[in-house]
Amino acid sequence: MTEENIRQIAFYGKGGIGKSTTSQNTLAAMAEMGQRILIVGCDPKADSTRLMLHSKAQTTVLHLAAERGAVEDIEIEEVMLTGFRNVRCVESGGPEPGVGCAGRGIITAINFLEENGAYQDLDFVSYDVLGDVVCGGFAMPIREGKAQEIYIVTSGEMMAMYAANNIARGVLKYAHTGGVRLGGLICNSRNTDREIELIETLAKRLNTQMIHYVPRDNIVQHAELRRMTVNEYAPESNQANEYRILAQKIIDNKNLAIPTPIEMEELEELLIEFGILESDENTAMLVGKTATEAPVV
């Protein structure tokens, strides 16, 4: 497949939501289906490829460039490794804490990969991106017109939904100039009350779909302890099949939309409606009250 025809997707989500775990398990399932895949990790934790490679952390492009003095002194084989089902794996890396911008590492890595032929003979390139905030750096795959399909990993928890709405706002900012579209919300379950209904409602408000609900299963943690995807660790498990279903949905997805992010007040109203957040009236009764003093509401 020519570079022009490669589908470039990105997984965004707040820290701790299970974004990297969800993306790697889904991409492993896609690779099982014969898709040729390159993962570009864009998270400073450099954990976007560890399950594919059975490793703690891959050497990053930015770290090696700093050691050598320039990215031109790196060989592609040093930073692009092959993992489960021949998935190609790269970590862009990030700056030292408090110094520089994450976007520098991301765009340096992407340019280096393109210039050295890493995007040849691929069906998908996947960017795994931190999404607590969509600052200029972490929005780089969108800003530069690389990622065209965005999938947001979220859950029925308030901060995960808040981050999802912020990410949708970032997608909207570049939708008309770069052609990026929102492919859907992936609900990585936290077993909160009415979680499926809540995320489906949020998806409609954002003009997108809940593309899949991934149930919570301890087998995911068992696989992670072994630095493996569920599809490799327990290929016959129900959870592995869930990732295969999600993988097929992404492969077949034509529902790519310009998102309609909502205001904070509307998000809070939605959370109140589903019992995630207390109403102002109830909150006023609770603020400053100890466990023994607080009224039951």
UniProtKB/Swiss-Prot annotation:
- PTM: The reversible ADP-ribosylation of Arg-104 inactivates the nitrogenase reductase and regulates nitrogenase activity.
Iron listed as a keyword? yes
According to its UniProt record, this protein's enzyme class is oxidoreductase
Q: Which Gene3D superfamilies match?
A: P-loop containing nucleotide triphosphate hydrolases
Q: How is the cofactor bound?
A: Binds 1 [4Fe-4S] cluster per dimer.
> Catalyses which reaction?
N2 + 8 reduced [2Fe-2S]-[ferredoxin] + 16 ATP + 16 H2O = H2 + 8 oxidized [2Fe-2S]-[ferredoxin] + 2 NH4(+) + 16 ADP + 16 phosphate + 6 H(+)
ADP-ribosylarginine found at: 104
What are the names of the required cofactors? [4Fe-4S] cluster
- Family per similarity comment: Belongs to the NifH/BchL/ChlL family.
This chain belongs to the protein called: Nitrogenase iron protein
The organism is: Nostoc commune
Q: Which gene encodes it?
A: nifH
